[in-house]
Amino acid sequence: MKLGVNIDHVATLRNARGTSYPDPLKAAEIAIDAGADFITVHLREDRRHIRDEDVFNLKKSISTELNLEIAATEEMLEIAKKVKPYSISIVPEKREELTTEGGLDIVNMHSKLSSIIEEMHSSSIKVSLFIDPNIDQLKYLEKLGTKPDIIEIHTGDYCDNPSEKKLQLITNAAEYVNKLGIECHAGHGITYEHAKKMTRIPHISALNIGHYLISEAVFYGLHSVVKTMKMTMSN
């Protein structure tokens, strides 16, 4: 199972004082050296953490794949076409939220998402959609004219208040996505304990983890916590 390390909150710390440090690129390099399989950043419309120049620097400099999380807006899609990351992940976005609060509403967005996927594929960019583990939403993937390359299952509800029932919803969602022939990732709120459970779910091929790793890095160092997470996932 692959580990994608989200380094947004390195930029949050930098922006808190308006300094040039800590540098997200340095964090990415450390994470990669410790075993991260790819790097994820979320370029939000309000630029509250990652900025445009961070994304371009990362694409130019890192040795692994870059996954760029963005909202489904014309501005962000144009930036993606200029950056040309390995993949983009379309996420819902509200200015007032502290973090992404849920998955995309595919029921009401399937035609828009189809055109976005087609547009990105024409620029050789893979597309991931961030979706709740809700089969009623996932069924609408079959209505998409062009299929996404990846579905990332939103694990926040489970991670905030774990239960076997919620874990089963994630398991069922991953199985459904796999039957459609789409790669399945998972992310949001994942800790070491959650990761142990996620690695037992068939069909999930990668986890995206950010806030927890950066928080633990304050006490134990980024290299150490990324390495520990990789070991946790491989066990």
UniProtKB/Swiss-Prot annotation:
Q: List the disulfide bonds.
A: none
Protein residues bound to 1-deoxy-D-xylulose 5-phosphate:
8-9, 44, 49, 99
Q: What is its main location?
A: cytoplasm
Q: Quote the InterPro entries the UniProt record gives.
A: Aldolase_TIM (IPR013785), PyrdxlP_synth_PdxJ (IPR004569), Pyridoxine-5'_phos_synth (IPR036130)
Cellular component aspect of the GO annotation: cytosol
Q: Quick one: which residues bind 3-amino-2-oxopropyl phosphate?
A: 6, 17, 189, 210-211
Q: Where is this site: Transition state stabilizer?
A: 152
Membrane-spanning intervals of the chain: none
Superkingdom of the source species: Bacteria
Record's family? Answer: Belongs to the PNP synthase family.
**HAMAP family per record:** PdxJ
What function does this protein fulfil?
Catalyzes the complicated ring closure reaction between the two acyclic compounds 1-deoxy-D-xylulose-5-phosphate (DXP) and 3-amino-2-oxopropyl phosphate (1-amino-acetone-3-phosphate or AAP) to form pyridoxine 5'-phosphate (PNP) and inorganic phosphate.
Q: How does it assemble?
A: Homooctamer; tetramer of dimers.
- Mind telling me what this protein is named? Pyridoxine 5'-phosphate synthase
Species of the source: Wolbachia sp. subsp. Drosophila simulans (strain wRi)
Mind giving the lineage of the organism this protein is from?
Bacteria, Pseudomonadati, Pseudomonadota, Alphaproteobacteria, Rickettsiales
